[in-house]
Amino acid sequence: RGGAAFVDMDGEFWRDLIDQNLVLTALCGRAEAKAMLAQGRGGVIINVSSGETTRPSPYMGAYGAAKAGINHLTQTMAVELGPSGIRVVAIAPGTTLTEQVRAAFDDEHVAAIRESNPLRTMTEPEELGRLTVFLASDLARCITGQLILADAGAHLSRTRPPNRSPSQ
C-alpha cells in the first residue's frame, strides 16, 4: 500500500506507511549498529530509500515523505556511527523491473517509463544487487551518508510516465 490521493490519506494511512518504511528502517539500523559496535570492527549499513524522494509524484506523497525520512536518517546515522568505522548509505531505486512491476503495468506503460528517462531503460533487480555489493565493499570505503540514485536517470527527466491512480 503506497499510493493514494492526498485528500484520501488519513492518519492511519500515514502512520502505516511511516512505520513500514521509516520506523522499521530505523529499528533495523539500530540493531545492526549495536551489533557492529559490540564487535568493534566497523561495517556498512545500507538503507533502501526511493527515487520518489527526488521529485513529487501524484498519489505518492506519504510514501515519498517516509522514504525522504530515510535519507535524513541515513545522514544522521553516518555522522553518529562514522567515528566507530561504520558507514551508512542509502540506495534509491527508481521503478525497477521486478515481477511485481511487470504484473502491475502493461507493456505500454513499461515502455513509457523507459522512454521517460535519459538512459531509456529501467533498473533491473540484479543491478541493485551489484550496487549493494559495491557499496558494502572496501572499494566504497570513502562513501558514507550518501543517497545513491539507481533510476536510469529518471530524476533528471522533465517528463514523467503516464500517472496511474491507485485504483488503476
Q: Model-found features: residue ranges?
A:
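Substrate-binding pocket helix/loop in short-chain dehydrogenase/reductase
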Residues: 2-6, 10-18, 113
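Active-site loop-to-helix junction immediately N-terminal to the catalytic Tyr of the SDR YXXXK motif
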Residues: 4, 56-64, 76, 161
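Active-site helix of classical SDR
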Residues: 29, 66, 74
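Alpha-helical segment proximal to the catalytic Tyr-Lys
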Residues: 34, 79-83, 141
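Residue(s) in the substrate-gating loop at a strand-loop-helix junction
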Residues: 50
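C-terminal helical subdomain
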Residues: 90, 108-143, 150-152
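Short C-terminal tail/terminal secondary-structure segment
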Residues: 144-168
